[in-house]
């Protein structure tokens, strides 16, 4: 039924993805570079997920959220990276209308879910530092599962809303997407029908989600900072900062790179420039997250040593 609706609404049956650049001399170097990036992202996130599963000392709320963050980054990179790599080796990288809408849906689902998971992680750090005596009660397995389920549910709802609005548009003439993936803003200029609802949806839904998540994260860290200031021991300071450091870096990278891609001065707000900024949060952030949590975390380092001993013994 959906397939019939999409065909009736649009005369375009497929789109052509322009990719990151059309300069021939850059195609091979960029293919190798992003293939290495993709391999590192997949291996890094799979390794971290396996470490958390195999080591009982990592079966805590903090690592439960981290497992889901790695799972999202793993899936997230698989949504568009293979198709992006094809753009470097094919003369014409096409994607069907249905495939484009599916890619858009899963991209939005995972990126929104990651935003909410990062918010849940900030709340977890707040409870761990500010309410250590009741931490296990507040962050019970039931509450943790509820927070993760809510994160995925909110991501699903947002993706459904945006994709549903996009499917309703008519695409008549141009089918060339000036991007390496199907995203909201590269698709809107191709529509020959009104995009007012889509633009309103993007402003309201995305704006509300960002404000809500950022507000919860900022309040959580404000409370943590207030608590740290009143700590008497330097050891407490060090432990608190060590616990939050990795998450602060991850949040800064995720939201900072996202803002670069979508919130720019009007003079620079073009899709062509946006796709270069998109590389940071679509390709670099999923690759860096496992490294950030591995290099700065003693528990993960210990888990690596234990797992390595099991393999070699």
From Swiss-Prot:
Glycosylated residues (UniProt): 8
Cystine connections: 100-192
InterPro entries in the cross-refs: GPCR_Rhodpsn, GPCR_Rhodpsn_7TM, Olfact_rcpt
Pfam family, one: 7tm_4
Tissue specificity comment: Expressed in neurons in the olfactory epithelium.
Cytoplasmic topological segments: 49-59, 118-136, 230-239, 296-313
Membrane topology: Multi-pass membrane protein
GO cellular component terms given for this protein: membrane; plasma membrane
Subcellular location(s) per record: Cell membrane
General function of this protein: Potential odorant receptor.
Family per record: Belongs to the G-protein coupled receptor 1 family.
PANTHER family per the UniProt record, alphabetical: OLFACTORY RECEPTOR (PTHR48018)
Protein name per Swiss-Prot or TrEMBL: Olfactory receptor 8C8
């Amino acid at each position: 039924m959906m397939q019939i609706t999409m065909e009736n609404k649009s005369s375009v049956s497929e789109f052509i993805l322009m990719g990151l650049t059309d300069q021939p001399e850059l195609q091979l170097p960029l293919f190798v570079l992003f293939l290495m990036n993709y391999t590192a992202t997949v291996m890094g996130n799979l390794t971290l997920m396996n470490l958390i599963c195999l080591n009982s000392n990592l079966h805590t709320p903090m690592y439960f959220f981290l497992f889901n963050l790695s799972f999202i980054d793993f899936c997230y990179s698989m949504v568009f990276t293979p198709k992006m790599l094809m753009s470097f080796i094919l003369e014409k990288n096409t994607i069907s209308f249905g495939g484009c809408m599916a890619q858009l849906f899963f991209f939005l689902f995972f990126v929104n879910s990651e935003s909410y998971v990062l918010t849940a992680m900030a709340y977890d750090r707040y409870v761990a530092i500010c309410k250590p005596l009741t931490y296990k009660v507040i962050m019970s397995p039931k509450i943790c599962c509820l927070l993760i389920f809510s994160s995925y549910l909110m991501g699903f709802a947002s993706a459904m809303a945006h994709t549903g609005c996009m499917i309703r548009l008519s695409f008549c003439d141009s089918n060339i997407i000036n991007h390496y993936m199907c995203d909201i803003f590269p698709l809107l200029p191709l529509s020959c029908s009104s995009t007012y609802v889509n633009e309103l949806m993007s402003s309201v839904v995305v704006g509300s989600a960002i404000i809500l998540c950022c507000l919860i994260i900022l309040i959580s860290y404000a409370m943590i900072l207030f608590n740290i200031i009143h700590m008497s021991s330097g050891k407490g300071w060090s432990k608190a900062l060590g616990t939050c450091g990795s998450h602060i870096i991850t949040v800064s990278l995720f939201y900072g790179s996202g803002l670069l891609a979508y919130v720019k001065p009007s003079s620079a707000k073009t899709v062509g420039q946006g796709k270069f900024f998109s590389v940071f949060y679509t390709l670099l952030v999923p690759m860096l997250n496992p490294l950030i949590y591995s290099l700065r975390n003693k528990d993960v380092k210990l888990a690596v040593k234990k797992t390595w001993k099991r393999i070699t013994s």
